[in-house]
Amino acid sequence: MARTALLTVGRFPAALTLARGLHEHGVRVVVADPMKRQLCSVSRAVAKTFQVAPPNTDIAGWERDILDIIERENVTDLIPTSEEVCHVANLAPRLTKTARYVGPSAEWITQWHDKLAFVNYAISRGVTAPSVYTTADGEARALIRQTECVLKPRRGCSGTEVSFIPPGSTLPPPSQDILLQRRVQGNHLYTLSWVDAGEVKATASYRGSTHSGTVAIGFQSAPTPFSVKQWIEQFVADTGVTGFLSFDFILDRSGIPWGIECNPRLSSGVHFIEEAWLGAAVMGEASGSPSISPAGKRAQWSYSTLTEAYKHLFRFQIPELIRCLRDLFVSRDAVWSWRDPLPFILMTPLCWEFIWRSIRERIPIGDASQCDIAWHWFKPGFQQEFRQETPEETAIMPRGNEREA
């Protein structure tokens, strides 16, 4: 039987890469997104696109829209591609037996997406993660007296509201939603893993080569150290999870990987996995070893890289400008394809909705692109108000206990 995959956001390059991989494997791909026009809407890999209600302001409408698309389009596979994974996981128990949800369950999302609960879980699995506390915890004051720290939202994404503070700094008002974490000095490494029934089938590692704020827009493939492979395998073992898992690591001077956060979803590492293998793997039909780009291969979002280059030029930041230009001229564009050119050609008008939101509301473009779908901007109580399921079926972010790594 022919399979139809529904991607629940299509505005990002990672979703486009996944759509192309699924299409190459013979899967019919449809996309739902609160944006009327987005990258996937003009792709040859996508059969249909649907504009749906934004889940952060109309969760009930969004759920109705997704369930309606699943029924009308005979969707066999429901696949989240970005921060909307939290909403999709909550919806998954309501799917019929003919539709498969591809991603972590709400139970796992609550433990992995929450940056405090993530550290608790990682330590319980015997892997390394730096100590973290809410600013309401007395231990946070002791920590900032001892060492440099990172201040960040408990459910943030895309580097939102992240700041580094020196020892002895004054903490912001106590909050259960703001975290203070020990800063680990070392080299950053990002990973994307495809996990099937709790078994890691492929991992692509990469580093950011060009950044817009704290968000990487240029990427360089990197080898995956054995210690990182072990860390990921130990983290997901016995979970039974099938889906994409992304991790941010810092490797200290001893080579020890410290897990900073988990994004239980697709990420830019997908640009370093062969599309044909990727599409087959997501459908549970892959054979042979995954094809991962060799270390040193580069990819970029060239429009974003060019924007950063202009910014550095106007600010006379010559070293940063040179780095941007190097990426611009030597890196493969993650969106461009001779067989599917329109997403690249039309990228600026297709992204105009959140570009304009960024200008109008004076917020970073990363925030503007996520604020209608990501849990960082979602009020959990709002979902309880509209959902008809029992409380046990609704994922609630836990208030975990702080633990030292």
Predicted regions located by residue number:
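ATP-binding N-terminal substructure of ATP-dependent carboxylate-amine bond-forming enzymes
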Residues: 1-103, 398
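Hydrophobic anchor at the start of a short beta-strand
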Residues: 27-30, 129-130, 149, 178
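A conserved helix-loop-beta module that forms one wall/lid of the active-site cleft
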Residues: 47, 95-166
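Glycine-rich phosphate/pyrophosphate-binding beta-alpha loops
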Residues: 159, 210-214, 219, 263-277
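Phosphate-binding site of ATP-dependent enzymes
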Residues: 162-231, 250-259
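Conserved metal-phosphate-binding beta-hairpin within the catalytic cores
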Residues: 237-272
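Peripheral (often C-terminal) accessory segments that flank ATP-dependent C-N-forming ligase machineries
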Residues: 281-405
